[in-house]
Amino acid sequence: LDPKLGPEWNKFFKFLHSDEFLNALKKFSGVAVDKMKTFRFVLYQKGGFQLPHIHNDGPSTLIVFFYFSKGWEKGDPGGTYVASEADESKIIFEPYNLDNTMVILQDGPYSAHGARYIVKDVKRKAIQIYFEGYSEETGWSGGEYEGADKPQV
């Protein structure tokens, strides 16, 4: 448990590590994930965005975004979109309800995603979590992640 986080967050964090959750995630996605790799709080505000990009870390990586932004209006930019290639004009899905929702994408060579430029005075609150295949012998199925030397929550 992390003393910097409240009891609700610690309960949520513990659940994300549970066999119950991991088995449900594997069953739902069909992706052989074994454990959580990263857990990050993310806050985007007016002027925030993320250019479209592709990680392609490996075939056993899921990226999950949980959103906690009340009153997000349909069509407003800021949710993590999914695109057919690393080009904002190729968006195929963009969440519009960011109040207690989630987006799951399987990482790979065609999993382009990003967030359009936020023009309103709003805050997009989210948690970004990577789940990935892991072995004691070989480590993470997708290798080390960018920022591995930095502390993660």
Which role does the model predict for each range below?
Residues 12-13, 62-67:
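Conserved short hydrophobic patches within well-ordered secondary structure
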Residues 6-8, 50-54:
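Short secondary-structure transition hinges
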Residues 42, 47-48, 55-60, 68-153:
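Catalytic core of Fe(II)/2-oxoglutarate
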Residues 30-40, 76-77:
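A short coil-to-beta-strand element that immediately follows conserved catalytic motifs
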Residues 1-28:
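Non-heme Fe(II)/2-oxoglutarate
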Residues 14, 27-33, 53-58, 72:
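Short, conserved, surface-exposed binding loops centered on an aromatic residue
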